[in-house]
Amino acid sequence: MFRRLLIATIVGILAAFAVAGFRHAMLLLEWLFLNNDSGSLVNAATNLSPWRRLLTPALGGLAAGLLLMGWQKFTQQRPHAPTDYMEALQTDGQFDYAASLVKSLASLLVVTSGSAIGREGAMILLAALAASCFAQRFTPRQEWKLWIACGAAAGMAAAYRAPLAGSLFIAEVLFGTMMLASLGPVIISAVVALLISNLINHSDALLYSVQLSVTVQARDYALIISTGVLAGLCGPLLLTLMNACHRGFVSLKLAPPWQLALGGLIVGLLSLFTPAVWGNGYSTVQSFLTAPPLLMIIAGIFLCKLCAVLASSGSGAPGGVFTPTLFIGLAIGMLYGRSLGLWLPDGEEITLLLGLTGMATLLAATTHAPIMSTLMICEMTGEYQLLPGLLIACVIASVISRTLHRDSIYRQHTAKHS
């Protein structure tokens, strides 16, 4: 047992450095190509001329597509192992290391050029790769899947500053394939990754800063639960839209570079209306949580961002949709809150409360992982007073979504690439 805890600690350290390496590479490319040192792609887009804002995501997608197509042609005669940690965990626990690194580099290109895709997906993949590489050299084969799971949880903890949510994400998604006794090393890796990440970044701040002054009352629980019902209906719709957009891009029968470039061009066109469509949505979420906009502003940004996310994911841009899903959930919750605020008092507090609820419940509706979704929002914002209400709402959202759409976003992704 001591050996496992020691390895879990090492995996956590490796994962933290993998996440930090990707984050610093991203900041470097943003500084080189966008003259942006703020870390916010929305700020970068705002400061660019319209024509650069239009073309930058398309050029990034084109470069990533050329890289992926070139690698595919170079290795077409070789046997292929998984390049995704979910696939590796469902097979024999092995990665195609070179292809996974190329995929991460392609993700770096589309992320730094403004595509509306999550950077955290590549971070978690690199963390799992680092764990797998270490495990294959120093541990028996039957443990490889455990250490990949530890690496993925640690990467999630370092990326989102949510070690418990990262651990439970692995447990919920892999329920039935991983015994509860294995959760100990996963938690150790996640916590160590968070601590090392805090040391590297010289900060232990929460991911999102929220000023929620409301004390949750009976009325608020009713609103939270109703938001869960709404998210349970919206989750399957979002998954269906993503699947339809992917099929639409595939039906065009474009070469990968042009397909990714088209997705980037759509993001560029949308950014002419609002720069907020650039990036994974983190800075937009923070601005909404700091000062919730008016109903029509939320609606406009939501529609543009939703189209950008669908274009980016549908075109096959390598990256995650975890953080974009958080923004979509926030916007749905805030739209619901603003609408209720027309009749109820404390409209600002209701909007903020239901925005946070929307983040958790839409995440639960798309991942079918309600416990993880609840803990993630609490860990990212520090609003643990919401935990009881969010847990109920997330379970409701997950049940409704699972009833309407059998596959979660991860099962849908696996089926799409199998």
UniProtKB/Swiss-Prot annotation:
Major localization class: membrane
GO molecular function, a single term: voltage-gated chloride channel activity
GO cellular component, one term: plasma membrane
Topology class, membrane: Multi-pass membrane protein
Keywords from the named record: Cell inner membrane, Cell membrane, Chloride, Chloride channel, Ion channel, Ion transport, Membrane, Transmembrane, Transmembrane helix, Transport, Voltage-gated channel
SUPFAM superfamilies: Clc chloride channel (SSF81340)
Function: Probably acts as an electrical shunt for an outwardly-directed proton pump that is linked to amino acid decarboxylation, as part of the extreme acid resistance (XAR) response.
Matches recorded under InterPro entries: Cl-channel_core, Cl-channel_volt-gated_ClcB, ClC, ClC-type_chloride_channel
Stretches of the chain found on the membrane's Cytoplasmic side: 1-4, 75-145, 201-221, 279-290, 337-351, 401-418
Residue ranges annotated as Periplasmic topological domain: 26-53, 167-177, 243-257, 312-315, 373-379
Family under the similarity heading: Belongs to the chloride channel (TC 2.A.49) family. ClcB subfamily.
Gene3D superfamilies: Clc chloride channel (1.10.3080.10)
Designated name of the protein: Voltage-gated ClC-type chloride channel ClcB
Gene Ontology biological process: response to acidic pH
Keyword Transport: yes
TM segment ranges: 5-25, 54-74, 146-166, 178-200, 222-242, 258-278, 291-311, 316-336, 352-372, 380-400
Subcellular locations according to the entry: Cell inner membrane
Organism of origin: Escherichia coli O6:H1 (strain CFT073 / ATCC 700928 / UPEC)
Top-rank lineage group of the source organism: Bacteria
